[in-house]
Amino acid sequence: MEEIIREDYFEALSSRNEEEQEMLRMLTKLEIDSAYTSEKLMNLHVLLMHLLAWDNDLEGMGTLDSSPASFEKALTFDLLCGILESEVKEVDEVLDVLEAQIVDTSYKISSCKHGNYIVIEGKLGESAESLKQSRGQVSEITLQLAQLRRTLHYIRNGTSENEESVELRQKYALKPSDLRHKNALRMLEKSLSRELELEKKLMEFQQNEEQLKLKLHYTEEVSSRMEEASEFIWGRFLEADNSSEVLTGISKELVGRLQILQFSLNGSAQRESELKSKLEDCTVQLEAKDLLVQKLEGTISENSEIVSEVLTLREYVKSAEQKLKNTDLELKSVNASKQEILVHLAEMENANESVKENLFEAESRAESGEAKIKELDAANLELTEELNFLKDADDKKTKKVNSLEKQVRELEVQVQNSKVSSEANQEQQNMLYSAIWDMETLIEDLKSKASKAESRTETVEEQCIVLSTTNSELNKDVSFLRQKAKSLEAMLDLANNEKERYAQEITTRNKVLMDMMLQLSSERERIQEQLYSLAKENKILRVNQCSNTYQRNGSYAGDKELSFHADGHEIEALAESLQEDERTREEPEKQSVSEKSSEIRRAIKLKHILVVALVFVLFCSFFGVTY
């Protein structure tokens, strides 16, 4: 039964440990998933900031006057919005799954209720709070996505909002530097919030570590106290074992004494049977004497005096017979008491040497009684001889009667002595009964003490087994807690390292982003200046071209007035030559203008390509970090 109980206990412990490990695994998985979703939401928020910054530049797109670069930018904006929307949907699905997992784990923890219930419940509360925060972020991103979709709808349909709203937007529109500053501040706020969350987690880990250290200290104290209690109980168990061994030795000695008493009682029973046979012989002899006395009465009836004497003698003989009967009854009672003694002695388990001495004295007294009976038999024989002698001689009757009276008196004295001896035997039997009763009580007390000692030893053994099992369980729990503490320390080290690494990466990426934003702004300003200078040059060239054409037209008119009277063939030749000169002059101007416009287009395309590539690289880098 004890082995079965132990097996059930160890199975329950193993099942409890497995449940705790499963709960911890689920909690770690939930924490990892929540961290993944929060990181992904941060990256999506950064992408949303970039899209909002683009939204301010996409006001004039979708019109007929817009260039293909603006259409390309609108397409990239649309693609990025679609990617952001799909990612937000995916994050929303992940949050639904996480919420279901949190509900499931909370139900399992409430059904189990093991030792780490408070810690696990706190971790679940933290994960639920982070899930609520991520839900709020998702809702904000969806609202801003709806605004971006509205702008895309206006761009696709080629319509814009009311002019008043456009004027208000232009009036209250933020500058690019303000937007950059605002985005940088938002990024810094998010990074500070993440650092605060990490510091909170570090504080929680430190508190958990302190609690685990306190638990380890308490378990070590409990194990030391249990070891002291087990040592004390083991000493008590050894004392009980020694006392049980002493009691077993005493019981063995008492059993040996009982066997000796049984042998002595068997000998006394044999002697009693011999005495019974002798008493029967005495009764037979007394009957024969009664017959002789009757014959003597017939002979003594002749003489009155002799008859009176014989009557007295008869009375004396009757009294002697009664005394003998009383002695027989006493002997029978003694036999019955001895039989009862035998029955009690069969149930007894202890004896004493004083009982042996009393039995030996009783045997000696029985032998003395046998000797007295022999003397009585001899006296009876003498009486019969004297009676026969009285028949022969009447003169000597008086003397013989006197002698007979003396002998009867002696017999009465002997009978009294036998009574006294029988009373002494009864007293000895009573003493024997009392001694036997005392021995029986001692045996019962010893039995009760032995049973109590056995029960105590059994309880001590059970307590030792329970203590050993609890000690082994405590050792296992201590080893498990130590391993857990080591793993938590390793996790803390990893978390610190990851925190430092993420902080370094964040700082480096912030620097890179700021540098890239500065480069983009400088390039944008340079390109705008180039466009402005090119536009001025274009205007100057157009003005020069117009002035040249007007001057040429005026000179040709003067020549015509001067040479009005010239021949028609000469005028046509001059006109053709002038047209050829204008064509030769306009061709290099057109080529220079077309080359400048192509360079401008190439610069704009390169700018858009660089911006798209930069956004794509940033997008890939952030999603690479999340994954």
Curated annotation (Swiss-Prot):
Single GO term (MF): myosin XI tail binding
Lineage of producing organism: Eukaryota, Viridiplantae, Streptophyta, Embryophyta, Tracheophyta
Membrane-protein topology: Single-pass membrane protein
Subunit structure: Component of Ran complexes at least composed of WIT1 or WIT2, RANGAP1 or RANGAP2, and WIP1 or WIP2 or WIP3. Interacts with KAKU1. Core component of the LINC complex which is composed of inner nuclear membrane SUN domain-containing proteins coupled to outer nuclear membrane WIP and WIT proteins. The LINC complex also involves nucleoskeletal proteins CRWN/LINC and possibly KAKU4 and the cytoskeletal myosin KAKU1. Interacts with WIP1, WIP2 and WIP3.
A single Gene Ontology CC term: membrane
Expressing tissues: Ubiquitous.
Protein name: WPP domain-interacting tail-anchored protein 2
Cell compartment(s), UniProt: Membrane
Keywords: Coiled coil, Membrane, Transmembrane, Transmembrane helix
Gene Ontology terms: biological process: regulation of establishment or maintenance of cell polarity regulating cell shape
Chain spans, region Disordered: 577-597
SUPFAM superfamilies linked: Tropomyosin
Coiled-coil parts of chain: 81-152, 188-218, 312-542
InterPro entries from the UniProt entry: WIT1/WIT2
